[in-house]
């Protein structure tokens, strides 16, 4: 099953093709930034395809897992959108956008939604996916309680003229330690 990223990140109310993957609509969906919506859907799709979600579309509570993404741009799109709200003064600053001005927030949204308990963070790197996979392998080698880590790359480039955005990458993989 493949989704049109450009379509679902703009959906204020997810349609049935999305809810079949994400289950219950996250309470914060309406105020989520595009990167968070992408993370929730893409990570849910990956978990579903790997048969790692229970019937309630949550990760089995016995499984300890993690989420690590690499990014070249971090939360630049949201940072710029937030700064644009400051143009008319601090009283017009968007508290909703401010909450998404850290690059790990999309992962936190996905982790909360699917009840993922384990390391969850983002790394800024010129080789985002490679760096995330390297970090995932480090965790798996050093914490035997972790079943798997979803390593990914998530970057959205801003349109500086209009402060709009275009997805440039959204890739995720399940990384497991190979027991020889």
Enumerate the predicted regions with their spans.
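Conserved "HGTGT" condensation-loop signature of ketosynthase/thiolase-family condensing enzymes
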Residues: 1-180
């Amino acid at each position: 099953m493949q989704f049109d990223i450009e379509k679902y990140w703009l959906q204020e109310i997810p349609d049935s093709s999305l809810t079949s993957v994400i289950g219950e609509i996250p309470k914060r969906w309406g105020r989520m930034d595009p990167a968070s919506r992408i993370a929730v859907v893409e990570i849910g799709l990956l978990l579903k395809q790997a048969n790692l979600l229970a019937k309630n579309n949550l990760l089995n509570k016995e499984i300890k897992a993690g989420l690590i993404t690499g990014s070249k741009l971090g939360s630049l799109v949201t940072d710029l959108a937030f700064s644009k709200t400051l143009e008319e003064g601090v009283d017009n600053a968007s508290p909703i956008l401010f909450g998404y001005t850290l690059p790990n927030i999309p992962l936190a949204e996905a982790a909360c939604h699917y009840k993922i308990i384990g390391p969850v963070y983002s790394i800024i790197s010129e080789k985002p996916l490679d760096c995330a996979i390297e970090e995932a392998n480090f965790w798996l080698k050093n914490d035997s309680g972790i079943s798997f880590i979803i390593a990914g790359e998530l970057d959205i480039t801003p349109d500086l003229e209009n402060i709009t955005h275009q997805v440039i990458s959204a890739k995720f993989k399940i990384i497991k330690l190979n027991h020889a």
